[in-house]
Structures are given as structure tokens and as C-alpha cells.
């Protein structure tokens, strides 16, 4: 996403690198909250959950979850499975930002306008999210299975090998539909809100003011995106966590039917399991990504065009 509508354009490779650096920066700082989010989302709260072996540990909040993980499993567990999203992060975030810029150009041509409107920002963001989903699904599946409290995999490569052996190559794409829904809604909300917030704030005249505006816009965008996509993220986690050899009941398949199953069995609140750690990660994470991405783009712009 361009940090300034009047800024000189940069080739795709610069957008790709800027997005990759932004994503890896956010992941390194915020990953423990992603582990907490997954633990909450995989908690099944039906009366029969314990009987089918789904309820292993109950957590009473983000801090309680962090404490229990460190106490019972060790500090390193907070970063268990990070190698998979770390490998994913560069193409994921690069796709998010670079494809968003490319889709903006496509929609501007489609609607015969030179202006980036909020509708174009939302459409471009959602389209970039769906493209991003196709890239990240295998990495997401490995990450979810590694983060699960019941995980017995020796590492990401062990998880990858066993998944392919037991479920085939296509098993790595389990949950792609829910991932596309999740990413389209988050990206559409994130980029749409960033556009609106930036236009509503006083024009930044200094680098410090631009950074402030990006921090605020990114935080609000990350929060709105999280509110929109959390139910689909819960479904994605449930679908991807169950492997082919598991004894768990396989009742989560397609996205929308799974939403109804969770709602009927556990209530509306279950669709927002993990919302607090998720928003605690993605609100400041959204700010961090936007600031780093904008900073990297400005750095490359200075290199290419001079001050």
C-alpha cells in the first residue's frame, strides 16, 4: 500500500521486499500471542468435549494462558512452530502489500479513475487477501498443528512429512476455503480503514507526523480486520488441527457449515475465541507492519530517486 498517493511509484520487487521485512518484524515480536490465540480457538466447550478428548487445558485469559504454557511446557513453547510462519512470512506479507498495490491499479483501470477511493481500497485489499491465502495455507496448517497443546510432532518437517504421508499433498491445503474468507475480510477491513483514517487525520508535514498517522491507522485497521475475520479464523484453526489419523470427531469441513456447527453447539461467543490475544497482536502488529513497510518504501524511494 502506498504510503502517499503522490509518492513516486516503485517496481514490484521493492514492494515485495518492504512487505517481507514488515511481516518478519511483526512476527518476531508478536508470535507468542498467536500461540495463545490458537490455544483458545482449539478449546471446545461443549458438554461432551472432555469425553471425546478435545478439552485438555482451560485458560482463563491471555496472561493465564501465557503463564501455564511457560510453567508446564517451557518458555520455548511460546515460539513452537515459528519456523513455518517465518518461512511463510516473507511471501505472505509481501503478497499482502505488493498485490494490494497491483490490485489498486487494476481496479482504477476497471473503474476508469486515477483516484484511490475507499471502495477501491476495500476491493483491492480483499483481492490481495484471497491471493495471499493461496500462498500461505500449507504453512498455516503446519503452524496450527505445531501450536496445538496435543501436538506430538517432533518439528515442522516431521509434521510436513506425516501430513503428506497420511493425507497426500492436497492435505496441506486443508482449510483453504476458510483461509480465503479470513484473509479477504481482514485485508479488506484493514486497507479500507487505513484509507479512511488517513484521510480523516490532519495532513502529515513531517516524518514524525507520518509515523504517528500510520501507527493510528494501522492499529484501527488491525482491530477492525480482526473483528471481521475472527469467526473464520476459528473455523480455519478447527479444520486444520484435525489430521487424518486423529481419533477426534471430524465435524469441521467446509467453512460456512462449520460456522453453524460451532454456533449451535457452543454459542455465538465461541466464534470469537482467541479474539483478545488476536487483537492484542494484530492492532499493534498492524501499526508495526504499516510503519515498517512505509519506512522501507521511503528508503527505497530515496535510493532510487534521491532525496
From Swiss-Prot:
Organism the protein comes from: Saccharomyces cerevisiae (strain ATCC 204508 / S288c)
Kindly list the places in or outside the cell where this protein is found, as annotated in its UniProt entry: Mitochondrion inner membrane
- Asked if the record carries the keyword Transcription regulation, the reply is no
Chain positions of Solcar repeats:
10-106, 116-200, 209-299
GO cellular component labels: mitochondrial inner membrane; mitochondrion
Q: Give the GO biological process terms.
A: aspartate transmembrane transport; L-glutamate transmembrane transport; malate-aspartate shuttle; mitochondrial ADP transmembrane transport; mitochondrial ATP transmembrane transport; mitochondrial transport
Per the record, membrane topology reads: Multi-pass membrane protein
A Pfam short name: Mito_carr
Q: Gene behind this chain?
A: ODC2
- Name the family the entry cites: Belongs to the mitochondrial carrier (TC 2.A.29) family.
Q: What GO terms are given for molecular function?
A: ATP:ADP antiporter activity; dicarboxylic acid transmembrane transporter activity; L-aspartate transmembrane transporter activity; L-glutamate transmembrane transporter activity
Keywords assigned: Membrane, Mitochondrion, Mitochondrion inner membrane, Repeat, Transmembrane, Transmembrane helix, Transport
Transmembrane feature ranges: 10-30, 76-95, 122-142, 171-191, 215-235, 280-300
Name-wise, this protein is: Mitochondrial 2-oxodicarboxylate carrier 2
Q: Tell me, what does this protein do in biology?
A: Transports C5-C7 oxodicarboxylates across the inner membranes of mitochondria. Can transport 2-oxoadipate, 2-oxoglutarate, adipate, glutarate, 2-oxopimelate, oxaloacetate, citrate and malate. The main physiological role is probably to supply 2-oxoadipate and 2-oxoglutarate from the mitochondrial matrix to the cytosol where they are used in the biosynthesis of lysine and glutamate, respectively, and in lysine catabolism.
